[in-house]
Amino acid sequence: IRRQRQMCIRDSNLLREIKPHQIFVAGDLADPHGTHRVCTDAVFAAVDLEKEEGAKWLKDCRIWMYRGAWAEWEIENIEMAVPISPEELRAKRNSILKHQSQMESAPFLGNDERLFWQRSEDRNRGTATLYDQLGLASYEAMEAFVEYIPL
């Protein structure tokens, strides 16, 4: 617990130094590797510490949660959708492929045999298709976010 507290203070100090206007965290907390939950919990703990200390920069900061490759936010819960061009989607795929943990299929959520990057692209394209079907602008893909508001 002492080590965790030291890490939280270090993370809090980094946030205080940067004073970000936006923080992006994984909202897919059922990640098979467990890393998404660990990272998200670390960010939330640092934000909570900053809040306890009365950090003024927090009122100008939004925390956005994205989903992993297995599921998307329900359309009625999406609070920000960012269009992704074909070139950006390729860059996202290449970024995913640079992570060894994403190179193989993960035994998670059923019998989906697609690789992580394939599920990710299909999810982003599916979100764009849904927005198009609702009569909104048409894009290659979209990344959807839900805002996390610390209590």
Where do the PLM segments sit?
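C-terminal regulatory/interaction regions
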Residues: 48, 94, 103-151
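Proline-aspartate-enriched helix->loop->beta-strand connector
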Residues: 10-31, 36-39
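Glycosyltransferases and closely related glycan-assembly transferases
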Residues: 38-52
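Short, flexible loop segments at boundaries between secondary-structure elements
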Residues: 49-78
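Short, solvent-exposed loop/turn segments at secondary-structure junctions
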Residues: 28-32, 69-72, 89, 101
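Single conserved hydrophobic/aromatic residue that forms the stacking wall/gate
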Residues: 1-9
